[in-house]
């Protein structure tokens, strides 16, 4: 409480008109960090057991859970990246918010309730329940960590970008600060603590975008912009390449199906009391995301009219941070810029917290012994590894890097969960082969596109950057073909497990308890 009082005293003692944008932004960011710590500390008082740290003892109701899922899901890509891409690339970038939201419809239809009925704590837990294979569990563990850390790195880069924009400090300061705050919060209270934090941060992020959009739209009153026919006819504009439509379809596949494979999203469905609550949570999440994504879309359109495009070498992600000062200026512009900067920091904190919990949960149960102390040590590792990855690397556009994580998730856990839940014929060999093929193709293509971006002719270069159009069908096909070739390996227990996944109520008791791998 003393920190809150100190920040309040600074604000009360300072005339807003005499403050620059940097000072106001720093105050706003400090308030968000203090609020995050205070709410997290409240949650720590309720976190005692391993179940509290991993899944909040499965007691989170749909309303709270939906706000928390939305809070952690609306990452740097949603807050900064979407608006910047729409401002620069035009209407084709709308596939990002559409895909980010529509993925929850597929999650609701195919995965949410059965996944909760499985009784798992993590995706590797689900794999062990469904197939009873330690080998498959180990592959899932490696993929959870790969996706979580691939997703975490752009969050840290985004934090560095924000602090650099508002203070002029080096990027590494913001990267280190967010990594340490997130790790400390997760170590202290686990899932129980970050549920409250993420729910608060959803509503704060919504306000941090909605208020600037309304105020700037009212003040500037942008006029109607006439578009020529050719501007609408350039299908795939912004994606480039000789076959832009293929890249758009690839992005759609990655975002529509990738939600089903994101470990920090899936782990939140283990926190609900039952399968019905998981499905109700998904409906509410879809509504909350739809409401939020209206505002970065409108902001992108307004920025396209009011701001020049970024210069060569400058990321589109910084446009939203500069927008209030360019569009309005003065005290109002500084206040709005501070609000946007604070909302961006909230986005980094919420998403990073969920990713660290997901990675720590997997490491604590699969590598360590699953105790509270093990979770805390795993959280330290889960926070420091992406920090070590982020410091020496150069940030790409945040939405594009996050899109890479979606592509890997869509190529691995999406086919595993969909086929594992709805097809009894998926064998252990088929699941392992599909994960290796999907993960290998997507990770390999993305690595090549980042390391050697100019070494490939079109259309290959574009498809390497957006590999889901090839890697997702390949993963599904591999799982099906290998399973058909090894169908003699199916055991009678699969029927009992599938009944537990699909039949509500007492029939769930037939499911096996997840076995822990040998130490």
Where are the predicted features?
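Membrane-embedded helix-loop-helix hairpins and adjacent transmembrane boundary segments
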Residues: 2-519
């Amino acid at each position: 409480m003393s920190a809150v009082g100190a920040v309040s005293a600074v604000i009360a003692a300072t005339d807003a008109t005499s403050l620059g944008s940097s000072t106001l932004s720093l105050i706003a960011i400090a308030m968000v960090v203090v609020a995050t710590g205070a709410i997290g500390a409240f949650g720590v008082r309720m976190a005692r057991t391993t179940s509290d740290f991993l899944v909040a003892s499965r007691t989170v109701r749909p309303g709270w859970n939906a706000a928390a899922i939305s809070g952690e899901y609306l990452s740097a890509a949603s807050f900064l990246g979407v608006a910047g891409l729409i401002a620069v690339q035009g209407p084709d970038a709308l596939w990002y918010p559409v895909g980010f939201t529509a993925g929850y419809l597929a999650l609701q239809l195919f995965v949410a309730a059965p996944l909760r009925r499985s009784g798992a704590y993590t995706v590797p837990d689900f794999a062990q329940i469904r197939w009873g294979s330690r080998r498959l569990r180990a592959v899932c563990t490696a993929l959870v960590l790969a996706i979580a850390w691939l997703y975490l790195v752009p969050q840290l880069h985004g934090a560095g970008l924000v602090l650099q924009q508002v203070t002029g400090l080096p990027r590494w300061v913001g990267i280190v600060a967010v990594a340490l705050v997130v790790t400390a919060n997760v170590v202290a209270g686990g899932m129980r603590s970050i549920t409250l934090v993420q729910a608060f941060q959803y509503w704060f992020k919504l306000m941090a975008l909605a208020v600037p959009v309304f105020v700037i739209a009212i003040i500037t009153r942008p006029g109607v912009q006439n578009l020529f026919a050719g501007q609408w006819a350039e299908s795939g504009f912004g994606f480039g390449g000789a076959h832009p439509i293929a890249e758009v379809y690839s992005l759609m596949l990655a975002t529509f199906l990738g939600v089903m494979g994101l470990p920090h999203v899936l782990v939140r469905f283990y926190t609900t009391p039952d399968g019905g609550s998981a499905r109700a949570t998904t409906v509410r999440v879809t509504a909350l995301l739809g409401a939020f994504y209206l505002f970065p879309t409108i902001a992108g359109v307004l920025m396209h009219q009011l701001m020049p495009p970024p210069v060569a070498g400058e990321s589109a992600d910084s446009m939203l941070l500069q927008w209030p000062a360019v569009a309005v200026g003065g005290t109002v512009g500084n206040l709005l810029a501070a609000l946007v900067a604070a909302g961006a920091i909230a986005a980094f904190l919420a998403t990073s917290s969920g990713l660290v919990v997901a990675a720590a949960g997997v490491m604590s149960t699969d590598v360590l012994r699953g105790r509270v102390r093990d979770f805390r040590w795993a959280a330290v590792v889960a926070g420091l590894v992406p920090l070590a990855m982020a410091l020496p690397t150069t940030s790409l556009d945040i939405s594009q890097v996050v899109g890479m994580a979606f592509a890997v998730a869509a190529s691995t856990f999406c086919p595993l969960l969909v086929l594992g839940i709805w097809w009894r014929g998926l064998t252990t060999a088929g699941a392992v082969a599909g994960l290796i093929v999907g993960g290998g193709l997507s990770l390999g293509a993305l690595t090549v596109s980042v390391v050697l971006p100019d070494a490939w002719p079109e259309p290959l270069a574009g498809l390497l950057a957006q590999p889901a159009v090839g890697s997702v069908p390949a993963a599904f096909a591999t799982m099906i073909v290998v399973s058909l070739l090894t169908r003699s390996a199916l055991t009678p227990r699969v029927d009992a497990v599938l009944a537990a996944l699909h039949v509500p109520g007492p029939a769930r008791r037939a499911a096996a308890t997840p076995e822990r791998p040998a130490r």
